[in-house]
Amino acid sequence: MTTTTAGALTALGGQTVSRETINLLHYLQIRFTGAGGVAIDPSTIDGNEIEFRDAAGTLVSLPAPTRVGTTDVFRYGLSADLAAGRYTITILGGSFADVNGIANVTETETFTLVSPTAALTDPVRGQVTYVDEFGTRGYVDITFTPAPGATLNVAEILALRPTFSGGGAESLTITSVTRQGTSNVFRFAF
């Protein structure tokens, strides 16, 4: 059986993707495929063919799509940045057709957006450290983990000058940031 689908979703379907990558693009692209690989009827793509939902199941409003050239790819703009979480795209059955008039079937795909993370490595998170001891040690180590498919922006991390809070830490000033070898651990000296 041959059906009309939105096949390009499977490239993203089930994947974990960098939130920042999607938010830099400010759009999602979907390639619609006709039955047996024939072209779709582009006049049947009007923005009412998909439902896009965030992790809470809330419908995310999308404007009518823009066709990319003369292809079967359509671009759906994003009016706001997407938060980290699992998203669902449902292509509604019967909402578009190929040039032979064969309507599509319902298709649902999901993808997860994640952000890079930073975690205190030394001292270990939750470790009790006295103010005097902390002040004389002169540094903290922080491990940065990029989102899947992304790399760390080392120059940006080296330029960071975070602030500390808590008993006595308010007067600390970061004097240098160094990468520990080729790892994702950075030492913030004060």
Locations of the language-model features?
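Aromatic sugar-binding surface patches on proteins
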Residues: G69-G77, G181-F190
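Short, surface-exposed alpha-helix to beta-strand junction/turn motifs within ectodomains of secreted
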Residues: L28, V38-P65, G149-S176
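Acidic, Ser/Thr/Gly/Pro-rich low-complexity segments and short DxT(G/T)-type signature motifs
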Residues: M1-H26, L59, D81-G138, T163
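Hydrophobic residues positioned within well-ordered beta-strands of beta-sheet architectures
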Residues: L28-I30, N48, F74, I89, ...
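Extracellular ectodomain surface segments
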Residues: R19-V38, P42-T44, V131-A147, N153-E156
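Hydrophobic residues in beta-strands and at strand termini
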Residues: F32-G36, L78, I91, L113, ...
